[in-house]
Regions:
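Start-transfer (signal-anchor) and selected internal transmembrane alpha helices
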Residues: 1-33, 222-224
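Membrane-embedded architecture of ER/inner-membrane glycosylation machinery
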Residues: 2-7, 176, 291-315, 319-359, ...
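Transmembrane-helix motifs of polytopic, lipid-linked glycan transferases
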Residues: 98-118, 156
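Transmembrane-lumen/periplasm boundary regions of multi-pass, lipid-linked membrane glycan transferases
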Residues: 51-56, 184, 188, 193-339, ...
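Membrane-interface transmembrane helices that cradle and orient dolichyl/undecaprenyl
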Residues: 157-174, 340-343
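Transmembrane-helix signature of polytopic, membrane-embedded enzymes
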Residues: 19-26, 111-133
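Specific aromatic-rich, kink-prone transmembrane helix
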Residues: 149-166, 332-335
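Short acidic/glycine- and proline-prone juxtamembrane loop motifs at membrane-interface regions
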Residues: 142-150
Length: 560
């Protein structure tokens, strides 16, 4: 058996040298995280449900301009993408999420390529692995929203600008692609595309004497070409609704910039980003310190300037939501890879000076660079972090056991998650103790770094398998799947009587045959069926019977 393994070593070595190997391994790393589910799906209200419902309206009506009967406040790119998937694969939650899954994979590959240029090849793969297991990032890779397609276009533009600088012979082509990406970004995300564009200005302006992107006419030509689909849509909208078409687009972005609809304060992202990217945000802070001490040649204003400027923009913007910060997450992953790689080398060598790869941004005279304030504690950090994660793992295991024994059936699935994640967090102390107390020197930095990646991967894989990343409204799903309710919905038009609340969009999407929208029950025909919102004070001017109730909504039938 040992002979066979040794005979396979040259084959494995050749595979690792293959150009496609990093992409294949990253794909194998993220695919289970995208696909694992409980076998049931339901949409997230409010945003995902809105995009799913509006895309379905386009497909059902055949009107791909404005099927809702009035001027719209958003550009139609996301609706066109989702509706196209409905046409190809049928109307379902999974079909609406396919574009984001594909975009998420392509973003992963782009981040790998960008990191390979900015950092080093080994750090590029680690960046991709970390990005895949950032919670908010993975969650939105599995949702039918426009965030991933926009980020794909933004990163494609950044990659193209870097390639244009690296290869002057093909700079016109790459600059055209950058402009085209920004133009198409407007189709996907409207004026929000200007947030990352502004975040790139430090690089574009302060490094202009070197790359001269801003005076390249193909950048602007590409931007205009990318705007053609949006201009075409606006033209058809203008023919129907006049100047209101333009007013709605501007009004929406002005409202977002002037009204804090969610009451998230100016410090929202200071706590939200660390929470939604745990634990990688804290590694990224270490990476940021290291990179600030030893700046990346040429691209420092991309690696550091872009996320910092974007963070400031989003904090100043009145409407603050978690997913607005998603453009920062690839850069958190890059900086986290720098920090984790540095800790891995300290784990393996302590504070002993040792050569590191020449492509690393953390080199100083060919030796490991240790900032002065970390020089004393640096050698203890890997050990302390290993033991801290072990304590966390034990606490999770104890909590999971407690829930299994005394918890209700509804929360026991969280106990499964706690049990598996708790076991995963024990990897780090086991690796540390095995190397430094039992002399297992084969447990190099790669094993220690894997001890960070594996528990996070397991946590998200189990969360997906339990339905926590795909089945957001199981109450509505189970209600609508009831035989008595499903038979009515499938065979009769359903009227809507002044539905309110953010979950009403779920009823819009899951109701196959729509009747009219009316203001009162008295407007309903005899024997008709309707959804009503119980929080509205409706006068029951006609007698009706309640067929079922889900939260604040009732399905009724008017008694003849």
């Amino acid at each position: 058996m040992l002979y066979r393994l040794r005979s396979l070593q040259p084959i494995w070595r050749q595979m690792r040298l293959s150009v496609a190997f990093p992409y294949i391994t990253l794909l194998l790393w993220i695919l289970p995280l995208l696909l694992f589910n409980s076998g049931q799906n339901s949409l997230m209200a409010h945003d995902e449900g809105l995009y799913a419902w509006r895309a379905r309206q386009m497909l059902d009506s055949g009107d791909w301009i404005a099927p809702w009967g009035n001027a719209h406040h958003k550009t139609p790119g996301p609706y066109w993408i989702i509706a196209s998937c409905y046409k190809l694969f049928g109307i379902s939650e999974f079909s609406g999420r396919i574009p984001n899954m594909i975009a998420g994979i392509l973003v992963l590959f782009l981040v790998y390529e960008i990191s390979k240029i900015l950092l080093a090849k080994n750090l590029a793969w680690l960046t991709g692995a970390i990005l895949s297991i950032e919670f908010l990032w993975l969650q939105y890779c599995r949702l039918g929203t426009p965030d991933m397609p926009m980020i794909l276009l933004v990163l494609l533009a950044i990659f193209s600008l870097i390639k244009a600088e690296l290869y002057p012979k093909y700079s016109h082509f790459w600059t055209l692609i950058a402009g085209l990406s920004f133009g198409l970004g407007f189709l996907v995300r409207s004026f929000m595309i200007f947030v990352p564009i502004i975040a790139l200005l430090p690089y574009l302006v302060l490094e202009h004497r070197r790359h001269r992107h801003l005076i390249n006419p193909l950048l602007y030509l590409g931007f205009v070409v990318g705007l053609i689909p949006t201009f075409s849509w606006l033209w058809f909208n203008w023919q129907r609704y006049g100047n209101v078409s333009f007013e709605q687009l501007f009004k929406f972005v002005l409202d977002l910039g002037s009204d804090d609809r969610n009451h998230n304060g100016a410090f929202f992202y200071i706590w939200n980003i660390p929470l939604k990217s745990f634990p990688w945000f804290f590694f990224s802070l270490l990476g940021l310190v290291l990179v600030l001490r030893r700046p990346i040649p040429r691209y420092h204003l991309i690696l550091v300037g872009f996320p910092l400027v974007m963070f400031a923009e989003l904090s100043l913007f009145s409407t603050r939501l978690s997913h607005y910060s998603l453009c920062i997450y690839p850069f958190i992953a890059m900086l986290a890879a720098v920090g984790l790689n540095w800790l891995g080398r300290i784990y393996e060598t302590g504070l002993i000076q040792k050569d590191i790869p020449t492509q690393s941004p953390l080199k100083k005279g060919g030796n490991i660079f240790i900032p002065p304030f970390l020089r004393v504690a640096g050698g203890n950090l890997p050990r302390n972090l290993s033991y801290a994660t072990g304590v966390l793992g034990i606490l999770l295991l104890l909590g999971a056991i407690f829930v299994f024994v005394w918890g209700s059936a509804d929360i026991r699935k969280y106990a499964i998650l706690g049990l598996i994640v708790g076991l995963g967090w024990l990897i780090l102390p086991v690796v540390w103790i095995s190397r430094y107390h039992f002399g297992q020197k084969f447990l190099t930095a790669r094993y220690w770094i894997a001890g960070w990646l594996i528990p996070c991967w397991l946590a998200l894989a189990v969360a997906g398998s339990l339905g926590l990343l795909g089945d957001y409204n199981p109450v509505y799903r189970t209600f609508l799947q009831q035989k008595a309710i499903a038979s009515v919905l499938q065979t009769h038009p359903i009227y809507f009587v002044q539905l309110g609340g953010k979950n009403s969009v779920l009823l819009n999407f899951y109701t196959p045959i729509h009747g009219e929208r009316v203001n009162t029950i008295s407007q309903l025909p005899a024997s008709s069926y309707a959804w009503i919102y119980t929080k509205n004070s409706l006068e029951p001017s006609k007698p009706y019977r309640i067929l079922g109730k889900v939260q604040d909504y009732q399905l009724i039938q008017v008694i003849p």
